[in-house]
Regions:
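Membrane-embedded alpha-helical bundles that constitute the cytochrome b-like, heme-associated redox core
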Residues: 1-174
Length: 174
């Protein structure tokens, strides 16, 4: 096994900050409070920076380098099902799908939160309902993400949590 640098500091700080802001807004702040709004705007700013970093960041941070394909997803699922070795230095295909799922759903969550505060949508229950649905959808996605990380860590014997903290994956020598 060999430590290989994968996740740059920006990606790791983005990941931790996004998780913290979402969890604070979901579990701690009061809906509609100033703090809830400020954290939502902060989350949107983080997402904007991550999109920029997805084009100019390091190799494994760039979207073009982990675009999932149907064939890649099928191969990865097959390897999981049949217990075959299928190590990925960056995101595996299912992990890549989850990245895009979370980035998109968090962006929609922020957008509906902002819209709910505008004159056009103020007090409209359906907008609040969409915002709440998206918050719950993100929470379920986060739970699935954590289950996927735990499963893949056990399956591959590569500690993905440690990799996100240190930026280095302990990869098998080929």
């Amino acid at each position: 096994m060999q430590d290989v640098k994968v996740w740059d500091l920006f990606v790791r700080l983005f990941h931790a900050s996004t998780a913290l802001v979402f969890l604070l807004n979901y579990f701690v702040t009061e809906d509609g409070s100033a703090l809830h709004s400020y954290l939502g705007y902060g989350l949107l700013a983080l997402l904007g920076l991550r999109v920029i970093w997805g084009f100019i960041g390091g190799y494994h941070a760039r979207f073009k380098n982990f675009m999932p394909t149907v064939a890649g997803v099928k191969e990865h699922i097959s390897a999981m099902f049949f217990g075959e070795k299928d190590d990925h230095l960056g995101h595996n295909p299912l992990g890549a799908l989850m990245v895009f799922n979370l980035l998109g759903s968090l962006a929609l969550l922020c957008t509906t939160g902002i819209l709910a505060e505008t004159d056009m949508f103020w007090g409209m229950k359906w907008m609040e309902d969409v915002h709440e649905f998206l918050a719950n959808y993100v929470l379920i996605s986060v739970a699935l993400h954590l289950l996927g990380v735990a499963f893949e860590t056990k399956r591959s014997k590569i500690n993905l949590v440690k990799a996100m903290i240190t930026g280095k994956k302990n990869m098998p020598l080929n």
